[in-house]
């Protein structure tokens, strides 16, 4: 007996676009001498005493087992000839904006998931093109021609399958999953490839003898619910290719923030305040991009011993003014008890967000 009703809308046309090794690809585009060489976006451990982590890397570096969140030291040990680049996040954001403008030519139903990936609902698109595959190919062509980068695309009738499809053939691939092929497509996938199934859930599923989509499909609904609660029903639906989550062009954001981890610890107040200023300006720019205002400013400080402090101040009025955000974040820092340990991370976040209701100038 089904505990929750199964409703499977297969009429939609959803595309998931995922840029290929985005940060590294931008660096290769701007410096062709990097092509064919292992490129790592992160601090060079030879310059930082082994500190720092990998933000991302290109496909050449991935051949050595390098991946995001790996320590820069380990990345260097795996591939001493790797080229380390600190990264230019303002440049990446500008390129990301350029790519999103391309998406908007085809549909306004664009849901960015990060700077380098997005869902598009092209069921009713601006150009009246019936084939979602054709639109995906046009987008790939436009991005290559105008931005000089490649992307992978997944096409299906829901977001879950479209994302799995975009991961199936990288880089610069295009995979279509039709409703009649969905069960076969899912059956062959390792369960850890299922989007939304975290590491702990994977371990639990493995303990139950579930390793593939085919294994998951054979498990009764009540068994999954007994082991995972409501998430068990989600797993039951995923195994059957069912997901009716809409593409939300205006995703509700609860906060907008900017934080940075430092390979070299910060001790001097002038350096600390300068980094707070950079984060504040980044937050103000993001608020501008998303047409949001905020009331509560949060400062996050992590020290060398990994002690982490967060403190917030709620303003009387909404703002997205960079100077005001910087001032308040700086005042919050001044109010913290002195800690002789150096600072390894600083973050500034704005919460209590509302849509822009007035033309408030952005002072950078």
Curated annotation (Swiss-Prot):
GO cellular component: cytosol
Reaction(s) catalysed by this chain's protein: DNA(n) + a 2'-deoxyribonucleoside 5'-triphosphate = DNA(n+1) + diphosphate
Site, Substrate discrimination: residue positions: 23
Compartments where found: Cytoplasm
Keywords tagged on the record: Cytoplasm, DNA damage, DNA repair, DNA replication, DNA-binding, DNA-directed DNA polymerase, Magnesium, Metal-binding, Mutator protein, Nucleotidyltransferase, Transferase
CC cofactor: Mg(2+)
Molecular function, one GO term: damaged DNA binding
One record GO biological process: error-prone translesion synthesis
Cofactor, free-text remark: Binds 2 magnesium ions per subunit.
Top enzyme class: transferase
Residues the entry annotates as binding Mg(2+): 18, 116
UniProt keyword Magnesium, yes or no: yes
Main location: cytoplasm
Residues annotated as catalytic: 117
The keyword DNA repair is assigned to this record: yes
EC numbers: 2.7.7.7
SUPFAM superfamilies: DNA/RNA polymerases (SSF56672), Lesion bypass DNA polymerase (Y-family), little finger domain (SSF100879)
Complex formation: Monomer.
Family membership: Belongs to the DNA polymerase type-Y family.
Function: Poorly processive, error-prone DNA polymerase involved in untargeted mutagenesis. Copies undamaged DNA at stalled replication forks, which arise in vivo from mismatched or misaligned primer ends. These misaligned primers can be extended by PolIV. Exhibits no 3'-5' exonuclease (proofreading) activity. May be involved in translesional synthesis, in conjunction with the beta clamp from PolIII.
PANTHER family from the UniProt entry: DNA POLYMERASE KAPPA (PTHR11076:SF33), DNA REPAIR POLYMERASE UMUC / TRANSFERASE FAMILY MEMBER (PTHR11076)
Listed name of the protein: DNA polymerase IV
Biological source species: Streptococcus pyogenes serotype M5 (strain Manfredo)
